[in-house]
């Protein structure tokens, strides 16, 4: 993975990392003038609510997907109209201000060309696959989860609420293997991606497990790539032989997100996973089995950090890494429509500390940056950024940024 070096000194990049954490925790507001200037879904890449609503509030207008800070650190756009950080227009520049003072200039991500194309059955490609920063493509085959039917949604998750709010409105439905194959082919043809992820909610009777095999075949057929550098994100299958089938189908990596390391928290916060996917112990066993199939550093498990004590999360990250699993964490956002809506995440410094320790765990256990990038749906996390800064891997701002005159 070759990326251009950032033009800023590391001291400035560490400041940007802290700002990214703050913007991720507290969100950002945007003025009408700035929003009209960047024109999401026309010039700037727009949000695609194919799985979760990550903003503080639902909305019926287009918002941008993300932006770059001056040193090249990318920040997902998380709208909070009450945030003290506000993106405003200053001439032809978009800037973050706080209490009237300029904090940083930002460059919004340019809308990819394939977003404007349609599949052979007439579906807009931008509703099928979402382009993430650093050349990652994300497919959510389903924007709903059957845990809801039994009242066992993960407490931090708003997948079903997001479908109810945005599904019909934005034309986001179940994706067919052919649709995914066609969008993958268009993204690769545009040279926009070099890694893709397939994920989604749990389907009754675990029918999604067979679906992953059909998707892999369709991607290979339409892209012409036998190795398409894909990650299959699944709930741990009860029959572990299914993991072998993912590898045989052509996926390079797999992921099973355990979410929480403390069993007590896990059973309370993730009742569906605890009761119908074999439980915490089976999940861990499945991850270790997957390492035997895919290899060291080719299996990932994510945790939603900030719900359980940091010490427990770190214990999990250490244990997973020692087993060959890339343990990652995401910043917990108490999303609208989730059971934990209205709760508060830890402070930004809490996550910065966890990110530094996570990156150190990765390196100590012999993972490469390529590995921790390939097995993640998005390698745009705080821990990935720390690795980039430490090893001079940050790209320049020329990576598909939006230039407006």
Language-model regions: role of each:
Residues 181, 185-189, 199-345, 350-353, ...:
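Conserved AdoMet/S-adenosylmethionine-binding subsite of the radical SAM
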Residues 146-149, 172, 176, 204, ...:
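Short, well-structured alpha-helical patches and their helix-loop capping segments
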Residues 132-134, 152, 175-179, 210-214, ...:
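Residues forming well-ordered secondary-structure scaffolds
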Residues 138-140, 197-201:
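Short glycine-rich or small-residue beta-strand-to-loop segments that form or flank ligand, phosphate
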Residues 1-98, 289, 293, 314-405:
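Auxiliary Fe-S-binding modules of radical SAM enzymes
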Residues 162-196:
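Conserved alpha-helical substructure of the radical SAM core
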Residues 66-153, 160-172, 392-396, 402-405:
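N-terminal [4Fe-4S]-dependent radical SAM core
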């Amino acid at each position: 993975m070759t990326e251009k070096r950032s033009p800023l000194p590391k001291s400035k990049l560490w400041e940007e990392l802290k700002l990214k954490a703050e913007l991720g925790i507290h969100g950002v507001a945007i003025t009408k003038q700035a929003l009209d200037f960047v024109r999401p879904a026309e010039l700037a890449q727009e949000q695609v609510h194919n799985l979760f609503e990550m903003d503080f509030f639902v909305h019926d207008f287009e918002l941008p997907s993300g932006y770059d800070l001056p040193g090249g650190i990318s920040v997902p756009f998380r709208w909070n109209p009450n945030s003290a950080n506000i993106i405003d227009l200053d001439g032809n520049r978009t800037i973050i201000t706080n209490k009237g003072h300029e904090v940083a200039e930002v460059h919004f991500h340019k809308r990819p060309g394939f977003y404007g194309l349609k599949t052979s059955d007439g579906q807009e490609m931008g509703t099928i696959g979402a382009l993430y920063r650093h050349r990652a493509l994300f497919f959510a085959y389903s924007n709903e989860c059957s845990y809801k039917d039994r009242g066992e949604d993960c407490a931090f998750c708003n997948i079903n609420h997001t479908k109810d709010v945005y599904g019909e409105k934005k034309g986001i439905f179940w994706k067919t293997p052919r649709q995914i194959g066609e969008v993958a082919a268009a993204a690769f043809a545009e040279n926009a991606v070099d890694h893709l992820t397939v994920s989604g909610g749990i389907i009754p009777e675990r029918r999604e497990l067979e679906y992953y095999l059909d998707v892999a075949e369709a991607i290979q057929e339409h892209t012409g790539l036998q190795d398409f550098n894909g990650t299959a994100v699944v709930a741990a299958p009860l029959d572990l032989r299914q993991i072998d089938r993912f590898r045989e189908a052509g996926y390079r990596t797999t992921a099973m997100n355990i979410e929480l390391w403390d069993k007590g928290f896990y059973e309370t916060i993730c009742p569906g996973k605890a009761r119908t996917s074999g439980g915490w112990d089976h999940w861990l066993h499945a991850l270790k089995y997957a390492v035997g199939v895919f290899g060291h550093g080719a299996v990932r498990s994510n945790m939603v950090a900030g719900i359980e004590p940091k010490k427990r999360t770190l214990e999990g990250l250490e244990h997973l890494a020692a087993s060959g699993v890339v343990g990652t964490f995401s910043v917990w956002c108490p999303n609208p429509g989730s059971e934990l809506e209205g709760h508060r995440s830890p402070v930004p410094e809490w996550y910065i500390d966890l990110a530094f320790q996570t990156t150190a765990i990765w390196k100590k256990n012999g993972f490469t940056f390529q590995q921790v990038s390939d097995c993640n749906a998005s390698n745009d996390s705080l821990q990935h950024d720390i690795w980039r800064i430490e090893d001079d891997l940050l790209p320049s701002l020329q990576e598909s940024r939006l230039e407006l005159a």
